[in-house]
UniProtKB/Swiss-Prot annotation:
Glycosylated residues (UniProt): N5
Role played: Odorant receptor.
Chain ranges on the Cytoplasmic side, renumbered to this chain: 51-58, 122-140, 221-237, 300-319
Ranges annotated as spanning the membrane: 27-50, 59-80, 102-121, 141-159, 197-220, 238-260, 280-299
Keyword presence, Metal-binding: no
Entry's Gene Ontology cellular component terms: membrane; plasma membrane
Cell location: Cell membrane
Extracellular face of the membrane: 1-26, 81-101, 160-196, 261-279
One BP term from GO: detection of chemical stimulus involved in sensory perception of smell
Gene that produces this protein: OR2S2
Superkingdom, natural source: Eukaryota
Family named by the database record: Belongs to the G-protein coupled receptor 1 family.
Full protein name: Olfactory receptor 2S2
Keywords: Cell membrane, Disulfide bond, G-protein coupled receptor, Glycoprotein, Membrane, Olfaction, Receptor, Sensory transduction, Transducer, Transmembrane, Transmembrane helix
Amino acid sequence: MEKANETSPVMGFVLLRLSAHPELEKTFFVLILLMYLVILLGNGVLILVTILDSRLHTPMYFFLGNLSFLDICFTTSSVPLVLDSFLTPQETISFSACAVQMALSFAMAGTECLLLSMMAFDRYVAICNPLRYSVIMSKAAYMPMAASSWAIGGAASVVHTSLAIQLPFCGDNVINHFTCEILAVLKLACADISINVISMEVTNVIFLGVPVLFISFSYVFIITTILRIPSAEGRKKVFSTCSAHLTVVIVFYGTLFFMYGKPKSKDSMGADKEDLSDKLIPLFYGVVTPMLNPIIYSLRNKDVKAAVRRLLRPKGFTQ
């Protein structure tokens, strides 16, 4: 295991991966490669149909196209490096490349948190205030909503990455992770990281707490409105328009809260299990969730399935 001199600055990092579990690495390589291909194909198809099919030129599918593009960017910022790490005995990464990866991953994660809350608002207006939907969710409204999600996520990423790269790293240069995950990198700093911790807590409130509360309140009103519909068929039809989004929210935020909110183990055996889970949970969040998103939206949405069929038919969008 490489260590930098205790007084010399770290010029690069070593990614530790699953070195304690070498028997799993080939299996994980194949699984992650297959999932990455599904992510590219599934999200790529969703982006195509939301652009090419005029029937899907609505706020909901505009947000969905943004989410699909974001998932491709998010996984591409880390998965190729993860795959490469399985093929090399010891994966090293330069300080600057690590900073770029931290920035991209953080920006994509923050943007997705806000995008999901914007999508919840879209569903709230569509179900609870349908007569004013076209006025409230006009193009002049939903495009700035999406743009602000990207801008705020990017700004937060710049702040956190800037704070992280200004820290001195003069000791252990081994990142106990697949990628340059910001929390794993901060553990290697040989200086006080109080500012980083405080800023991270503030960010957690902005990107986790506030969106979850907003989404929760939106769905309280949505479910209340659905329950007032007299027919069971009517309730089922209306709920189907937001069930895919609700499923994605539960998977996405459930993984995030488990990753950042779970208690830490104190005994050595528990620490070993925690060490493995600290790698597998972000892997699930960074690969499995983006893979599930297009599957969930295509299985739960008749419009998307019909658009995909039209895409596969010659001249399907010309009719």
